[in-house]
């Protein structure tokens, strides 16, 4: 699913892409209306969202806008805390998309939106270290694959990183989970053929323990890219 600006709401990129992939743009006002149904979660900085057909940015851009506004309200006066909270916000958003060009477009839109919002809030550019961290998080969280088969486009299982920020000193615990493991015993609005679905995860009520595929040592969040 994709979203366009109100000023230029194209419904499709091409008829061929609609025929081949069912790719249709979604109006921004409709995206916001749907997100308003879970408004409190979209404004909680660490609330996790997974969009299983994320297109070129759709819901994720609007979720980022809401989360970054929450970061501004809480931490704008302390740049160290703002930087860390903004990384938490980005780390909590996940997407799967079938088309490689859309994956790249989605990552770029989110990155550009982050940098623009950062400048507006801090009246300065993000540090090179922070920008590198955010790019890394987006590369790990926005994946090319099929959420129905739970496989990446290279045939490997879709695997997401769980980023858990510990305390206020910038330390992060990373654990990798296969999507199939995360969705075991979980029901959500998995899209039917020709339809789209949105998974709003993180209900705060875990029902059983998921088994990580891999765990990493506690790391400073700005150094996450060093531990691929």
Feature-to-residue mapping (PLM):
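SAM-dependent methyltransferase catalytic region
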Residues: 2-228
């Amino acid at each position: 699913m994709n979203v366009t600006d109100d000023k230029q709401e194209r419904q499709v990129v091409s008829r061929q892409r609609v025929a081949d992939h069912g790719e249709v743009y979604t109006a921004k006002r409709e995206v916001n209306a749907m997100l308003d149904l879970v408004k409190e979660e979209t404004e909680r900085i660490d609330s996790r969202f997974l969009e299983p057909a994320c297109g070129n940015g759709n819901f994720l851009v609007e979720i980022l806008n809401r989360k970054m506004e929450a970061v501004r309200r809480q931490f704008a006066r302390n740049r160290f805390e703002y930087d860390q909270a903004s990384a938490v916000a980005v780390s909590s958003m996940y997407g799967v998309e079938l088309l490689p060009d859309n994956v790249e477009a989605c990552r770029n839109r989110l990155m550009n939106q982050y940098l623009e919002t950062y400048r507006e809030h801090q009246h300065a550019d993000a540090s090179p270290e922070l920008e590198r961290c955010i790019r890394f998080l987006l590369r790990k969280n926005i994946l090319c694959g099929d959420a129905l088969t739970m496989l990446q486009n290279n045939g490997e299982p879709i695997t997401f990183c769980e980023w858990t920020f510990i305390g206020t000193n910038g330390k992060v615990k990373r654990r990798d989970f296969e999507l199939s493991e995360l969705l075991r015993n979980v029901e959500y609005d998995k899209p039917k053929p020709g339809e789209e679905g949105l998974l709003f995860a993180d209900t705060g009520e875990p029902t059983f323990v998921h088994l990580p595929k891999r765990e990493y040592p506690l790391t400073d969040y700005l150094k996450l890219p060093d531990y691929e």
